[in-house]
């Protein structure tokens, strides 16, 4: 057959690799990453496109390049006379910068790319996205007391700096989306005051997908995290979800007689560096989850640290050289490390590490009523481990991954609430455990180690020695599939 033979018969048509190109959810006025599709000629005849155009011209914000030709204003957002020989193909590139829509929820943005053959036959590919109006902040410096409280998402470029005499308050329900170069540096005070129903969310700004099954929001290293400098004190992160950072929370060395950070009912998840790193600081962690970090979930180098009713789960999926759930050393001097009613676990056989100090430096620490994936202490330091459950790494029925409701390594989805098989159930001390868990569920007379109090599904009543009669609440998801969100 002559590949140079072109037909004008309407019996022949092109084949598209998709009939609808979805560009995920995007922030209005912010360019999307480029997506592509292919146009194939499998008809047996050569075909000419007399016209390719955007149906709405420049009204939707889509930008299209067809086989190297940009459909811009000079060409009237169209092109013509494109040959697609038999068994050949052309590639189409699509981007979107959507205009503001004035709405508080994502709005559908849609256009059709129309392909008209010489025969007059018209074919189309639908271009579709959801556009979300956002407030854009660039290199924000807080020099006086300021509250950020927005119904719309806030996208941060370049970062936020809180001056030494200023307090930045993040109101409940606030969502901050950080670009890759952005984070928060605190010289003064940061107060993130989320609630159980409306947490503050700090995350990266990419709403698209790396793969169809994997949103970038589940990929670590998307932004730069929070740094509390030496002059910063009295910081509060309450009901705050911090995820997909590089280093999440760093505390510089400072006066340990003043509390530097109180982390309460919060989540730190999926970090390409460490989760929390405290260098000779006063740190309190309560009812919180720190999980899946390339570095240590929690690392303490001296200072004064109190940990209660918290979960440290080291299941970082992107690198087998992940560190531990907890590392501590005396650093320049340790006042105390006191861990109570908490769960330390992960993939490795030992996820709790410490560096023995020089004889001149004390290392006062203690673990009470904790579940720990580490070797049982047999030295004189065993007196520092009181009512501790040591995980047996060979036991795969109730330790490690078996503690938790969902460890989905294929789709990188995690729910660190307790499963009914967990050895953390009833392992805490009723006298010192927090009265409610990270979700606001009341702890019973035999409380559980970690941030989550086990909730038995209704079908499984009675459970946990007939003492726990709670309906399972909806799981807190650490990530939102933006395609599902936008569909609502």
Residue ranges and their predicted role:
Residues 13-25, 30-31, 36, 75-414, ...:
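Beta-strand/loop edge motif enriched in small/polar residues
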């Amino acid at each position: 057959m002559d590949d140079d033979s072109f037909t004008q018969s309407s019996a022949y048509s092109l084949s598209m690799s998709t009939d609808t190109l979805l560009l995920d959810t995007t922030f209005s006025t912010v360019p999307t990453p480029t997506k592509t599709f292919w146009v194939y000629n499998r008809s047996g005849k050569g075909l000419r496109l007399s016209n390719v155009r955007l149906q709405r011209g420049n009204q939707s914000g889509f930008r299209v390049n067809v086989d190297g030709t940009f459909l811009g204003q000079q060409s009237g957002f169209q092109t013509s006379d494109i040959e697609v020989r038999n068994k050949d193909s052309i590639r189409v590139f699509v981007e979107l910068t959507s205009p503001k829509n004035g709405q508080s929820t994502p709005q559908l943005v849609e256009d059709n790319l129309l392909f008209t053959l010489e025969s007059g036959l018209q074919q189309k590919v639908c271009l579709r996205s959801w556009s979300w109006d956002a407030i854009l902040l660039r290199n924000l410096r807080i020099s006086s007391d300021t509250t950020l409280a927005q119904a719309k998402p806030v996208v941060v470029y370049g970062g936020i700096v809180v001056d030494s005499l200023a307090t930045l308050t993040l109101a409940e329900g606030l969502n901050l989306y950080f670009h890759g170069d952005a984070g928060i540096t605190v010289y003064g005070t940061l107060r993130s005051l989320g609630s159980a129903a409306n947490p503050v969310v700090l995350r990266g700004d990419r709403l698209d997908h790396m793969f169809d099954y994997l949103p970038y929001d589940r990929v670590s290293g998307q932004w730069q995290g929070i740094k509390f400098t030496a002059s910063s004190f009295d910081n509060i992160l309450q009901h705050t979800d911090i995820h997909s950072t590089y280093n999440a929370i760093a505390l510089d060395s400072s006066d340990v007689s003043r509390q530097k950070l109180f982390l309460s009912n919060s989540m730190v998840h999926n970090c390409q560096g460490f989760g929390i790193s405290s260098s000779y600081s006063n740190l309190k962690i309560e009812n919180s989850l720190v999980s899946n970090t390339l570095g240590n979930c929690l690392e303490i180098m001296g200072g004064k640290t109190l940990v209660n009713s918290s979960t440290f789960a080291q299941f970082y999926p992107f690198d087998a050289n992940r560190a531990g759930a907890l590392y501590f050393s005396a650093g320049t001097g340790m006042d105390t490390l006191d861990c109570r009613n908490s769960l330390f676990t992960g993939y490795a056989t030992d996820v709790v590490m410490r560096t023995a100090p020089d004889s001149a430096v004390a290392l006062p620490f203690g673990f009470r009523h904790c579940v720990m994936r580490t070797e049982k202490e047999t030295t004189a330091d065993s007196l520092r481990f009181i009512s501790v459950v040591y995980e047996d790494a060979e036991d795969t029925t109730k330790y490690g991954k078996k503690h938790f409701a969902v460890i989905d390594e294929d789709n990188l989805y995690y729910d660190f609430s307790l499963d009914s098989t967990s050895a953390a159930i009833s392992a805490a001390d009723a006298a010192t455990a927090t009265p409610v868990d990270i979700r606001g569920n009341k702890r019973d007379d035999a409380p559980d180690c970690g941030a989550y109090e086990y909730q038995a599904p209704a079908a499984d009543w009675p459970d946990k020695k007939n003492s726990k009669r709670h309906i399972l609440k909806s799981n807190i998801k650490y990530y939102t599939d933006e395609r599902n969100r936008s569909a609502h």
